[in-house]
């Protein structure tokens, strides 16, 4: 009976009423195969988990790699991040910001610096601006590279192309460029 209660408690902890069944099944598989706990509301796409991880509520991981024994707090948005072992990522940490051109002209509207005909039906894009990279990648091929045993505080924003070394501590509210 005790074992059954334990199993039901763990299932309830990751169950999300608004979550499609396929996410629930993925979370169950991750838990039993790699001891990865993904709380309700957490989502991931094209993300690799090494195992023994915890992803808290409402966090989103896309195109990322999470090494062993790393922890993601609630409300994080991690796009293209490689996270090392034994990392603690605080709440509301964001990665994967795209850049806007500022050298030859300044624009915030996507249609001026990227071909948007498929999305909007029109585009003002005339070709790649020299020296402009919309997404800057690190040497590992990810947008953000976080080393081993790193502690990142709450409300941190990490820009594209940043590598954070092993053992680093990033203060709460920091913008890492």
Q: Residue ranges of each PLM-predicted region?
A:
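Active-site Tyr-X1-5-Lys
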Residues: 171
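Domain-scale signature associated with acetyltransferase and cell-envelope carbohydrate enzymes
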Residues: 1-149, 155-156
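Beta-rich strand-turn-strand
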Residues: 158-165, 174-177
């Amino acid at each position: 009976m005790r074992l059954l209660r334990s199993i039901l408690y763990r299932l309830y902890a990751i169950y999300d009423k608004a979550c499609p069944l396929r996410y629930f099944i993925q979370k169950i598989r991750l838990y039993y195969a790699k001891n990865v706990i993904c709380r309700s509301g957490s989502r991931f796409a094209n993300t690799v988990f090494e195992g023994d991880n915890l992803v808290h509520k409402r966090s989103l991981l896309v195109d990322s790699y999470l090494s062993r024994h790393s922890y993601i707090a609630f409300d994080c948005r991690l796009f293209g991040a490689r996270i090392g072992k034994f990392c603690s990522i605080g709440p509301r940490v964001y990665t994967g910001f795209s850049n806007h051109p500022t050298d030859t002209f300044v624009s915030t509207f996507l249609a001026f610096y990227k071909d948007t005909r498929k999305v909007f039906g029109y585009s003002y894009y005339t070709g790649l601006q020299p020296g402009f990279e919309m997404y800057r990648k690190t040497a590992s091929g990810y947008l953000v590279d976080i080393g081993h045993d790193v502690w990142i505080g709450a409300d941190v924003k990490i820009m594209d192309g940043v590598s954070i070394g092993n053992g680093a501590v990033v203060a709460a509210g920091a913008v890492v460029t």
